[in-house]
Amino acid sequence: MFRGAWMWPGKDAAALTICCCCCCWAPRPSDKPCADSERAQRWRLSLASLLFFTVLLADHLWLCAGARPRARELSSAMRPPWGAGRERQPVPPRAVLPLPPPPPGEPSAPPGTCGPRYSNLTKAAPAAGSRPVCGGVPEPTGLDAACTKLQSLQRLFEPTTPAPPLRPPDSLSRAPAEFPSAKKNLLKGHFRNFTLSFCDTYTVWDLLLGMDRPDSLDCSLDTLMGDLLAVVASPGSGAWEACSNCIEAYQRLDRHAQEKYDEFDLVLHKYLQAEEYSIRSCTKGCKAVYKAWLCSEYFSVTQQECQRWVPCKQYCLEVQTRCPFILPDNEEMVYGGLPGFICTGLLDTSPKRLETKCCDVQWVSCEAKKKKFKESEAPKTHQQQFHHSYFHHYHQQYHHYHPHHDPPGRVSNKPALLPVSGGSRLSPSRIRLCVLVLMLLHTVVSFSSNQGGGGLGLETLPALEEGLTREE
């Protein structure tokens, strides 16, 4: 046995070295509690710091990843996507005066031919499709057909009825001929079927009554009637030139109004869809009111076919009330100020400009659409309910800094709020986060104090392990 031990000196030396190292580096009873206590204190501080930063990072990622997609979801549900064409609501057919039927001896033209048509012209016209081409020229449609579909108008004037003398072209001072009111009513039934392309709430009849001199043209009813009689009397004389010139002038103003509306729509999309701006609101009602106000400015006439009328200047107040504030936000302060649209000239009572009346329209409320959207949603999870409560608090805070002003004539039961230029945001989620962090820190401090007071510490764990090893 001794011989074997001396034959392997390297192995014994290694065992002796390991034993010495363990004895040298083993903690002494005097300094072991101090070292373990210092090491445990460092671990506790590291754990507390790691826990604190983890909670802050989780809260930030939670708000960034959950709240903003939620806002985009609400925004996309409230407004149509950019680039999509605006859907026009179908206008209900208007009640028109019946046109006289064709003579009994004349057969009615079969469908698909080029005979005279007795219908409501453009309002009840069939959809664009296969239409017969008469004489090699496509049949005009829309507003252009108001002065070309003369088959029905030619029957309004019987050949036996003597026509009133027309106004000579060289005598401008002579008054135009007066026509009976019955024929004007039949002419009214014809022009009430045609509306503008963009400002589709205005008929040609409304424009002829209230705006009879567009671009210095004479578009009075007597002038149009006299020109129509001349066309009917001599079929080869040409088209209804006076009517065509007036319709073209109205169409130019309508296109100009549509260009201004497109510019306004572009501004709303630029500032309300960008990430660096805070406002997320329903702009559908704002656009509808702005369109109505814009058309009332370009066509200062009274709309004839309305159930109730309001002054057209009321549209301007609706735009100022419904359109949002276009103001930046830095996520710390909500800025207050004037609205993005301000009405001017409402107090102008000069007799030069007659006050026109427009239809009293019940505008669609954005709150009703939001309520319908919420009712159609699937049941929310706890996390979605938290994000919803956060944005509900944000919208309440926004309405606090930007109070809603009702137009004149409406009584609001809401209490008035004091104007505030700005205020800090402190959402309930951040309050709950601070309480959670304080509770965790209190737990760590309590655990540390229990260890320092002689409770069960980390230094007793190695002793327990040694006792179990000896028993085995």
From Swiss-Prot:
Record's bilayer topology term: Multi-pass membrane protein
Q: Where is composition skewed (Pro residues) in this entry?
A: 90-110
Record protein name field: NALCN channel auxiliary factor 2
Family stated for the protein in its record: Belongs to the NALF family.
The cellular location(s) given in this protein's UniProt record come to: Membrane
**Could you tell me what this protein does?**
Probable component of the NALCN channel complex, a channel that regulates the resting membrane potential and controls neuronal excitability.
Q: Which organism is it from?
A: Homo sapiens
Transmembrane ranges? 47-67, 433-453
| GO CC, alphabetical | plasma membrane
Q: In its keyword annotation, does this UniProt entry include Transmembrane?
A: yes
**Region feature (Disordered):** 77-114
Residue positions with a glycan = N120, N193
Q: Which gene encodes it?
A: NALF2
